């Protein structure tokens, strides 16, 4: 009985669900084509979905090399021979972490973001690092680089401290040296490289005061009014406009070139301690990686794109920007946008989940709650169908207004045409005067009106189906969704009250008969004949 009631309740709910009316899409597409809408005739700007060539890389300009900001990530490794220097080494390491806020201690995630990227154009600056045991990130060919800086990563540098200097701020040596092609640098008299960028912390050891004699001009990247300068002390690039004077306010704290050279360095701190007879003892090693902090900029290394370069990297890289591959599709090209009709619509099989009817009112109450959820979803779908129908009506009215404007404009154009024909009647009309082959206008407003009428009919049909059904009466669905969860427990209680006494009576008779049979069997097994009422002595 409960299963039959469940089926009766679920049947109208499942029947209320229907697939969307996909011919509406076909009508809308035909309407756009017949009205000559720009959405159906203009070119489409599309991005490539191919995974082989995900995009194209463009190199950064020399000025962008001076403005793109980089950041450093530091990691350290203890020397296994610390022994008695563990406490002072910990003190020195805590000083390093506190005094250099421009260095991040969390290591970044390495690896190429994209591969098979093509570099368009010539890169003004490339940086090459060669290390036998380094991490290869990719190599650009020399033909795409205007100026190539070669980093000498084989330099191993240590900073020496005595035991009583552990509490002072450490000063690391300058970054590794870089070499340049012959004739690239010109010694120009300028003080532009001196000073410190305003965005840099005063405790940053990478921007120590620069030497005046170490500020050199890169001839291949400079012009008469604009100079690209290299500070060999800090391995940083500066852009100077000779007509506006020197100003380093826009210079980032850590530049790209400085970060790339620092990431190839091998830095360590040693100490002269009395524990080892005042001999030079290594304490710990620093490994520094670099990342681009400016949004949209990447390291371009060969055909790979990186956001960060690991410590001890090797290869040839430049910086630039990446754009996805874009192609222009003409208006008459069929784009891969599937539009289905009723006959082509792939039907989705919907499985109906039946709750097993087990004993207990709790299971039946859960069934009522499930029915309420299905009803709520059906009501939501109906409301969505109404909104879609309203939107279609609005779109049809808008297209009707556009068509009326086009008809009005066509009437004005034809009126002007008649006037021009009268003025050029001696030459056979404006068409012959201009030697035009197509001089006729085909009025297709009737097709547009027919398509709009069909679109409105489809919207009206969709709205009627959404408002039909015993669960969609206007004004009842708002309170019915609250009452429906109590129907399951109420019906279960009603069934229990109707059939409970009968079931209890049957169970009582069954138990009584079984007890009488057991008692009779017990008397027979004891050898006594049961007495009837007539044989009783009483």
Swiss-Prot record:
Cytoplasmic compartment spans: 500-538
Transmembrane segments annotated in the record for this chain: 479-499
Annotated positions for site Cleavage: 350-351
InterPro entries attached to this UniProt entry: TLV/ENV_coat_polyprotein
GO (cellular component) term, any one: plasma membrane
Residues spanned by motif CXXC: 43-46
Region Fusion peptide: start-end pairs: 354-374
Residue interval(s) of motif CX6CC: 431-439
Motif (CKS-17): 414-430
UniProt keyword annotations, A-Z: Cell membrane, Cleavage on pair of basic residues, Disulfide bond, ERV, Glycoprotein, Membrane, Signal, Transmembrane, Transmembrane helix, Transposable element
Role according to the record: This endogenous retroviral envelope protein has retained its original fusogenic properties and participates in trophoblast fusion and the formation of a syncytium during placenta morphogenesis. The interaction with MFSD2A is apparently important for this process. Endogenous envelope proteins may have kept, lost or modified their original function during evolution and this one is unable to confer infectivity.
Similarity section: Belongs to the gamma type-C retroviral envelope protein family. HERV class-I FRD env subfamily.
Subunit structure as annotated in this protein's UniProt entry: The surface and transmembrane proteins form a heterodimer. They are attached by non-covalent interactions or by a labile interchain disulfide bond.
Entry remark concerning the domains of this protein: The CKS-17 immunosuppressive domain is present in many retroviral envelope proteins. As a synthetic peptide, it inhibits immune function in vitro and in vivo.
Designated name of the protein: Syncytin-2
Protein's organism: Hylobates moloch (Silvery gibbon)
Gene: ERVFRD-1
């Amino acid at each position: 009985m409960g299963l039959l009631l469940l089926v009766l309740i679920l049947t109208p709910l499942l029947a209320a669900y229907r697939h969307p009316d996909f011919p509406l899409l076909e009508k809308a597409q035909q309407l756009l084509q017949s009205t000559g809408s720009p959405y159906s005739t203009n070119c489409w700007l599309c991005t490539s979905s191919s995974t082989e060539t995900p995009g194209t890389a463009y190199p950064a300009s020399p000025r962008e090399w001076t403005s793109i900001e980089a950041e450093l990530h530091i990691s350290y490794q203890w020397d296994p021979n610390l022994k008695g220097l563990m406490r002072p080494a910990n003190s020195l390491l805590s000083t390093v972490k506190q005094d250099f806020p421009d260095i991040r201690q969390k290591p970044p995630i390495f690896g190429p973001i994209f591969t098979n990227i093509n570099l368009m154009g010539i890169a003004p600056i490339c940086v090459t690092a060669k290390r036998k045991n380094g991490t290869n990130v990719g190599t650009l060919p020399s033909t795409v680089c205007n100026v190539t800086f070669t980093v000498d990563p084989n330099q191993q540098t240590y900073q020496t401290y005595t035991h009583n200097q552990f509490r002072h701020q450490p000063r690391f040596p300058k970054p590794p040296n870089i070499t340049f092609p012959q004739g690239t640098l010109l010694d120009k008299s300028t003080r532009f490289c001196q000073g410190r960028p305003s965005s840099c912390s005063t405790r940053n050891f990478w921007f120590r005061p620069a030497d005046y004699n170490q500020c050199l001009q890169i001839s291949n990247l400079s012009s008469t009014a604009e100079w690209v300068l290299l500070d060999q002390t800090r391995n940083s690039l500066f852009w100077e406009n000779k007509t506006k004077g020197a100003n380093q306010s826009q210079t980032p704290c850590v530049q790209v070139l400085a970060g790339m050279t620092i990431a190839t360095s091998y830095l360590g701190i040693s100490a002269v301690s009395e524990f080892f007879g005042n001999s030079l003892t290594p304490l710990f090693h620093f490994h520094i990686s670099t990342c681009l902090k400016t949004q949209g900029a990447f390291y371009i290394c060969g055909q790979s794109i990186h956001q960060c370069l690991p410590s001890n990297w090797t290869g040839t890289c430049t910086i630039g920007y990446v754009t996805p591959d874009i192609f222009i599709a003409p208006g008459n090209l069929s784009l891969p946008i599937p539009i289905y009709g009723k006959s082509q619509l792939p039907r989705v099989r919907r499985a109906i989940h039946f709750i097993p009817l087990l004993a207990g009112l709790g299971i039946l109450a859960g069934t009522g709650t499930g029915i309420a959820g299905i009803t709520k979803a059906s009501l939501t779908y109906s409301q969505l169908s109404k909104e879609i129908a309203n939107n279609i009506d609005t779109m049809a009215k808008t297209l009707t207004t556009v068509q009326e404007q086009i008809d009005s404009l066509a009437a004005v154009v034809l009126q002007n045409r008649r006037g021009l024909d009268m003025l050029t009647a001696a030459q056979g009309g404006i068409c012959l005067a201009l030697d035009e082959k197509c001089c006729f206008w085909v009025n297709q407003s009737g097709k547009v009106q027919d398509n709009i009428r069909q679109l409105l009919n489809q919207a009206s049909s969709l709205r009627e189906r959404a408002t039909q059904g015993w669960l969609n009466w206007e004004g009842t669905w708002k309170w019915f969704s609250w009452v429906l969860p109590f129907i399951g427990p109420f019906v279960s209680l009603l069934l229990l009250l109707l059939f409970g006494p009968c079931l209890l009576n049957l169970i009582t008779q069954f138990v009584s008969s079984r007890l009488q049979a057991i008692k009779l069997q017990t008397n027979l097994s004891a050898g006594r004949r049961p007495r009837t009422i007539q044989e009783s002595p009483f």
